Amino acid sequence: MSTLRVDTVMTTELVTVGPDDTLGEVREVFDTHRFHHLLVVEHFKVVGVISDRDLLKHLSPFVGKLSERAQDAFTLQRKVHQVMSRNVVTIRADTDIAQATRLMLDHGVSCLPVLDERQHPIGVVTWRDLLKAVAHCGLDPLCRLPNSAA
């Protein structure tokens, strides 16, 4: 029986950051793109994930405000490796979405980097992607999503 696979729902437009990039740079990426997660990549390998929530948690709430002080602005200079999630759970593109969902729930994560056979990132699947698939297809294994890769 055919099942809906990760490659039919994953985002393939990857924007990555490096572990030595600053939180200021990450903030610019989040402001420019409509992502909630960024893969942290070093030498073509995923070494971490940083979410918009991680960013907000580690930036001063006074950045960009009239009451901003030097120590508030300094939070923009912190490095990605200081705040990223390091225990990354990854998945392959040919994995079915039920297994992807179980992995997210079992590990308490909201995204899974999708890796190729060389362990290089080729996409990312988020809980939103999985929820959209279920909302559109229900449990129909033959369903194809609009704009799907497969």
Question: Model-found features: residue ranges?
Answer:
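Tandem CBS (Bateman) regulatory domains
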Residues: 1-13, 51-89, 96, 101-105, ...
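Short, flexible active-site loop motifs that bind/organize anionic cofactors or intermediates
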Residues: 13-16, 45-46, 90, 120
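The conserved cystathionine-beta-synthase
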Residues: 17-34, 40-42, 81, 90-108, ...
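A glycine-centered beta-loop-beta connector
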Residues: 30-33, 38-54, 104, 112-128
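Short, surface-exposed, polar/charged, turn-prone segments marking secondary-structure boundaries
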Residues: 37, 44-45, 66-69, 76-78, ...
